[in-house]
Design a protein with these regions (language model features):
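Aromatic "clamp/platform" in nucleotide-sugar-dependent glycosyltransferases that forms part
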Residues: 258, 277
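Nucleotide-sugar donor phosphate/pyrophosphate-binding loop at the beta->alpha transition
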Residues: 64-68, 105, 115-136, 152, ...
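Short His-centered aromatic/hydrophobic patch
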Residues: 84-92, 110-112
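Short glycine/serine-rich donor-binding loops of glycosyltransferases
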Residues: 262, 282-285, 297, 304-307
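Acidic anion/phosphate-binding donor-loop and adjacent secondary structure
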Residues: 119, 152-193, 260, 264
């Protein structure tokens, strides 16, 4: 049986991680032997990996430190194809294949607009990523971008030949989305007769710009009774909680944290709002629409404009 390997730093909550779990599940359902190779096997999506996918834990704390472990894995397992996601993991995957000399077909994927990611960080290492991409990405068999905007930005920023970069939208709507959407939800805000709930879903980071959503919610409440719920965790939680207190919204804004099944919230929400400053694709927009929920998004680069009118 042909083996496929998928390589990631971890399964901490993010769109790329969820997409890779979906891919692993889909490949396994089609009869392939699938390994999910993680620099460190941790994160909330770990519980969503199906039993017919083997998790390989390289057991290191940083993606860079996974290089030798990934080289050993490639030599031992000789996968027919290897897929990776997130640019720092992509670079390690390419480097590992070069060192291992294993003839695995290597496909790397970009899930965010590179320019936006670089401009919105102070990390010196992150500023080196475009140079490393120029050096390493041509050595991959293919580079996948999750939207045309991400592809165009990647080509413009790094000078990669356009024929090297292929656009493939994220596999978001798996059959289980619909069964998950119909699971019971006990939260009192979603009971009959309660005010409509506006939903935001994503990591609490600068990219997702939930402060803009909270401030917009203040304007909505001046016209209509409503509540706001934000699903997700991240480093900006303290700032967001402080803003909610400052605006006197404690009774009408809830942040339950990361949830295993956001679909059942989406199905019962009046509206899903994506307030991001930038996106690669916008998985939650597709998920919410699959659940039958109206969506609104900022016109940010890159993905939402390719999903919505």
């Amino acid at each position: 049986m042909e083996k496929i390997a998928l390589f990631l730093p971890s399964l901490h909550g993010g769109g790329a991680e969820r997409v890779m779990v979906n891919l692993a599940r889909g490949f396994a359902e089609r009869g392939l032997n699938v390994d999910l190779v993680l620099a460190k096997a941790e994160g909330p999506y770990l519980s969503q990996v199906p039993s017919n996918v083997r998790v390989v834990n390289l057991g290191v704390n940083r993606t860079l430190y996974s290089l030798l472990g990934l080289v050993r894995y490639l030599k031992q397992e000789q996968p027919k194809a290897t897929l990776s996601a997130l640019n720092h993991a992509n670079i390690i995957a390419i480097w590992a294949r070069l060192l291992s000399r294993v003839k695995t077909c290597l496909i790397v994927s970009e899930h965010n607009a590179l320019s936006q990611s670089i401009e919105n960080t102070t990390s010196v290492r992150a500023k080196l990523i475009p140079l490393l991409i120029k050096i390493f990405y041509p050595k991959a068999d293919a580079v996948v971008a999750v939207s045309h905007g991400v592809a165009e930005d990647l080509i413009a920023r790094t000078g990669l030949p356009s024929e090297k970069v292929k656009v493939i939208y994220n596999p978001v709507v798996a059959p289980e989305v619909f069964s998950k959407a119909n699971e019971p939800l006990e939260h009192p805000w979603f009971q009959e007769g309660e005010p409509p709930v506006i939903l935001g879903v994503g990591r609490l980071t600068t990219q997702k710009d939930f402060p803009t959503l909270v401030r917009a919610f203040v304007l909505v409440r001046k016209e209509h009774a409503a509540r706001l719920m934000i699903l997700g965790d991240g480093e900006d939680r303290p700032k967001l909680e402080a803003l909610i207190r400052e605006l006197g919204l404690e009774k009408d804004v809830a942040m339950p944290g990361f949830v295993d099944n956001p679909c059942k919230y989406m199905k019962r929400a009046a509206l899903l709002v994506l307030s991001s400053r930038w996106e690669g694709f916008g998985n939650v927009l597709v998920e919410a629409m699959a659940c039958g929920t109206p969506v609104i998004s900022t016109d940010c680069p890159s993905g939402p404009a390719e999903i919505l009118e």
